Amino acid sequence: MTTPSSPTPTPTPTPLTPNALHRRVSAVGRLTRSLFDQVGAGSRFVVATLRAMRDTQDWLPEFSIHARVLGVESLPIGMFIALFTGIVLALLASYSVGDLVPPYFVGTLVQKTITLELAPVLTGLALAGRVGANIAAELGTMRVTEQIDALETLTFDPMSHLVVPRVLASTLMFPVVVGVAMLVGLLSGWGASLALLDITTPQFLKGVRIFFTDFDVRYGLVKSASFGAAVALIGCRAGLNTQGGAQGVGRSATRAVVISAVMILVLDAFWALVWLTGRTIR
């Protein structure tokens, strides 16, 4: 005859000891303090950059060079991304609405999504990798090879010579790249609608025009300008703070790309809250 087994006792959670609780609170405190330190250091860096903009004779000769490197040479990336984004958007719009709405609404959805969100954000994320890493690696190499120290010894201000032209070029050229990406995205969406969805050109253009406002373009371009400024500032600060030789340069480039991507998403949410809250489509 088998005896019934006794129920398994439920384990009671081990209470935190004072030392363990102190360690956890200390870790949270260190993380919070580090976050505020980084925000404060970043704010001081932005203020120093704005002050250095007064020395136009220092940064103006370098501006066109960086505008070409950071902006013009980034156009193929923006166009390539927008090309396939427009095609995918047209197909998704047709799949989502089906026969529920007139066919011209495909043009409306493509136009609104490209200009308001996808062209600025996707292009910004791609350029964060190219521009942010480029700036951080270039300035980081100059730091570890003591070129920046040599400039300071010769009484040249690194902020006006190195930081300001890159920040201004990135801020002004990001909207140019995004504007071209908007146009390419609309054209590719139109081409996909004609070739794959049996939507005529008048129908697609009707959908583009019916809810189009100049706010759509202004919103996307202003947002992209803020992305460009953030990417350049983060890349410059990461590069100037580089330590540890070649490995330090690699860490600075990686840090610049990651922080820039996060900041782009934060700014995207910020501009949506500021400009889109309570705003209707018309």
Stretches with model-predicted labels:
Residues L139-V164, G245-V249:
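Short cytoplasmic-facing helical segments at TM-TM junctions of multi-pass membrane proteins
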Residues R54-F80, V258-A261:
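Membrane-interface helix starts
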Residues H66-L122, A126:
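Active-site cofactor/substrate anionic-group-binding motifs, chiefly glycine-
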Residues E146, D157-V178, S252, A256:
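Start (N-cap) of specific transmembrane helices in multi-pass transporter permeases
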Residues L92-L116, M182-A225, L233-R255, W275-R282:
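Membrane-interfacial helix-loop-helix connectors in multipass membrane proteins
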Residues T14-E62, A238-Q243:
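Short, membrane-interfacial amphipathic segments enriched in basic
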Residues I81-V88, T123-A128, V164-S193, S226, ...:
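Hydrophobic alpha-helical transmembrane segments that constitute the membrane-spanning cores
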Residues V106-D149, V177, I234:
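Hydrophobic alpha-helical transmembrane segments of multi-pass membrane transport proteins
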